[in-house]
């Protein structure tokens, strides 16, 4: 395809669970139109569809858009989608010119190696950037050919969280041109039954919304459909501009007559806990406020505004105090006082009058607030029965008193001792976010950023509203230890009105009959209940929702588990952090989620530097969108990616490698000699040869020979590797590779992949990456990088069977005792070649080689190395050792025959 960039025609789609859709034209005037669509530089958005399926809070979104280039020149098109920060991308594909380019998810370290060139140059090859308060912006620019079309499809998933008595799905709609087929379709299935459902659009009058938005719910099902015609999209009857510009919002809640909402499918369960009609607990609350000089201006003004409103919301049964910290620490009363009218009036006066002072004694402010709550709980029994809450607001980092982050974390942990939650609010982008979040997570709370904007006071108030009405404290959801194999967080310090606690887990085989949930908590009165599984009801639900229910319950568990592991790793260091990170990475790969530990690449696309695009998940501390450099532009190949390109998931290959391929030729790289040696092994089909054996770790690679399907009896014919076994008994890792399938842990019924798959797998310290129809990489974290090459043969080939090649890319960290037909050559050895002369074959040269105190006749010849080019191979000049490597290998070749590949 011609890579020339024309004038830009941009499709912009912004999505959230919170979703937003947006299409933005660029410079230049419209030049064409199709069936009522107004073209932007000849590029038309033919269709734009958002499909959202919610099953028991698990939301699965698919955004699909088709654009058409009606010009005779290539055009640049951008697909732009905003997704919530809490969501994980799980799939992306582009179809253009009858070719489909799909995303591959792999671990971030592997992906980073591929894109280190872009990172070093300072350019940004990432497609996802932080955008706004709750969103991440996904954007990809591609060039499509003349008179052609491109279809983009993005999939992402999340678990909807209940806030203030409802679940929200918000779609920001801004296509910037009329769209022939525009559709938002939301399908909701909730086993508890839907209690309310509404949908509104900020860009439509109430009358127009009632006419255009179709919404209905009955029993377990709810549906919202917005499908305006081109005429209904017009801003006026004679206009060519669109009125679709604003928020499309769906809200719903579920029935809660039953205390128990326990869902089980395919040995996974989800437990939703949100009891109603409970008496609100009185609370002890201390507000710890940063009054350092950096809070000057709008920050302190809006903080005071929010505090005044929050004080007005306190109930007479609540107790409270205020702590201010700058260079010094001051408290309003120094102990909790009742939220009486007189005390509230005095507190409001104090808030209006306080002024800013100096630096940031964060440690001192927090410890003073904790001391006030601890003192109250220890002094009077009635205080201990209340729900205690500590809320801290700061805009910066500690600069006064104790400033060491580790020491502050320890001081706060030791002072709170798990008695109550700490909520940290960070004002603006200068706040040290990771430190803020870890401090909250270590103390049963959470962190939230308050953005510097006209509505900062409303943001503060909005956060407080979520924790203003505690109903229960010390909530524990318990499950039989022998029936549950994996479990998400099931202990919570407090449960607040309008929220929901969600626990998910995996049930052991044959343990469903003994599975139950015991819930206990402290409230106005003691709270205790037991939930059992209604198996008949589960069967009915499976009949209604089928595979979708089974799949979504498991993915809900995976989503929650990954989120919790990512949060947990922030609190850990060194080996513990590495262990938790490895678990989160493995689950991200298993369930194909783009998380902070994984990346998605799109094969078959490249920018001007030949780099494929990469989809990452930005961290909360990522720079705002406008602070980042220009995005890279990618061109779709006319066909699928060429096999001549090195694998993206395998490190850069040395100029020459050690390996074995074809019938079977062993190629031994001798770097200290800057030379290569070769030999063949002639054995019968079915024989298994030991290629690598490390007795110190148990790691091994064995290969089984196959022959020509049409062999002639009595005639020697070539053999090839048709089956490889890679194993590490110490960790239970086994990988069986054939030209048809790749099987992880075949002895225990592990997953099976075909060579048509693209996947990255991790087990313990081994990472396996499958590159579709080409090769497979195996990386041991403690040493050793290997590649398996797939040889697919054409129908007219004389061999008649597909086979495998095996290459060693890095062996320098393997133990000194590693051995095998290949591995014995990982260690340095010496030889001398002399008496080079014409051989019996006039086209080849013979010589005398002295190696291992033996004198051999060797022949100069050519072999092929397929590690870089699996299809054609690269010619390698080598000294060929005859008679099965006799004299070069230790012992004789039959010493390396083993019973099986494992």
Curated annotation (Swiss-Prot):
UniProt KW Zinc-finger keyword: no
InterPro entries linked: ITI_HC_C, ITIH, VIT, VWF_A, vWFA_dom_sf
Protein source organism: Sus scrofa
Residues spanning the signal sequence: 1-28
Domain (VWFA): residue spans on this chain: 282-442
GO biological process: hyaluronan metabolic process
Residue ranges of the region described as Disordered: 637-656
Phosphoserine modified-residue sites: 121
A Pfam family this chain is assigned to: VIT
Family: Belongs to the ITIH family.
Residues found modified as Aspartate 1-(chondroitin 4-sulfate)-ester: 663
Protein name: Inter-alpha-trypsin inhibitor heavy chain H1
